[in-house]
């Protein structure tokens, strides 16, 4: 059965401790990092300054 005792067999160090596909917490962190990066990209393009053309057409 999956549970807290199943996580004891994995001994990760470094960044693998937080981002892995074996534990529920690791998968959750991967999803949150993906959603967060997508949100940051959307905000960047939405909030960046709009450049005005140098010469306005009449």
From Swiss-Prot:
<dbReference type="InterPro" id="IPR009125">
    <property type="entry name" value="ATPMK"/>
</dbReference>
<keyword id="KW-1133">Transmembrane helix</keyword>
<comment type="function">
    <text>Subunit k, of the mitochondrial membrane ATP synthase complex (F(1)F(0) ATP synthase or Complex V) that produces ATP from ADP in the presence of a proton gradient across the membrane which is generated by electron transport complexes of the respiratory chain. ATP synthase complex consist of a soluble F(1) head domain - the catalytic core - and a membrane F(1) domain - the membrane proton channel. These two domains are linked by a central stalk rotating inside the F(1) region and a stationary peripheral stalk.</text>
</comment>
<dbReference type="Pfam" id="PF14960">
    <property type="entry name" value="ATP_synth_reg"/>
</dbReference>
<dbReference type="GO" id="GO:0031966">
    <property type="term" value="C:mitochondrial membrane"/>
</dbReference>
<protein>
    <recommendedName>
        <fullName>ATP synthase F(0) complex subunit k, mitochondrial</fullName>
    </recommendedName>
</protein>
<feature type="transmembrane region" description="Helical">
    <location>
        <begin position="23"/>
        <end position="45"/>
    </location>
</feature>
<feature type="modified residue" description="N6-acetyllysine; partial">
    <location>
        <position position="16"/>
    </location>
</feature>
<keyword id="KW-0007">Acetylation</keyword>
<dbReference type="GO" id="GO:0045259">
    <property type="term" value="C:proton-transporting ATP synthase complex"/>
</dbReference>
<keyword id="KW-0472">Membrane</keyword>
<feature type="modified residue" description="N6-acetyllysine; partial">
    <location>
        <position position="17"/>
    </location>
</feature>
<keyword id="KW-0496">Mitochondrion</keyword>
<comment type="subunit">
    <text>Component of the ATP synthase complex composed at least of ATP5F1A/subunit alpha, ATP5F1B/subunit beta, ATP5MC1/subunit c (homooctomer), MT-ATP6/subunit a, MT-ATP8/subunit 8, ATP5ME/subunit e, ATP5MF/subunit f, ATP5MG/subunit g, ATP5MK/subunit k, ATP5MJ/subunit j, ATP5F1C/subunit gamma, ATP5F1D/subunit delta, ATP5F1E/subunit epsilon, ATP5PF/subunit F6, ATP5PB/subunit b, ATP5PD/subunit d, ATP5PO/subunit OSCP.</text>
</comment>
<dbReference type="GO" id="GO:0005739">
    <property type="term" value="C:mitochondrion"/>
</dbReference>
<keyword id="KW-0812">Transmembrane</keyword>
């Amino acid at each position: 059965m999956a549970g807290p005792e199943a996580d004891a067999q994995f001994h990760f160090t470094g960044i693998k401790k937080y981002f892995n596909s074996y534990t529920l917490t690791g998968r959750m962190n991967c999803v949150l990092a993906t959603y967060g990066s997508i949100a940051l990209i959307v905000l960047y393009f939405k909030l960046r300054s709009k450049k005005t053309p140098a010469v306005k057409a009449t």
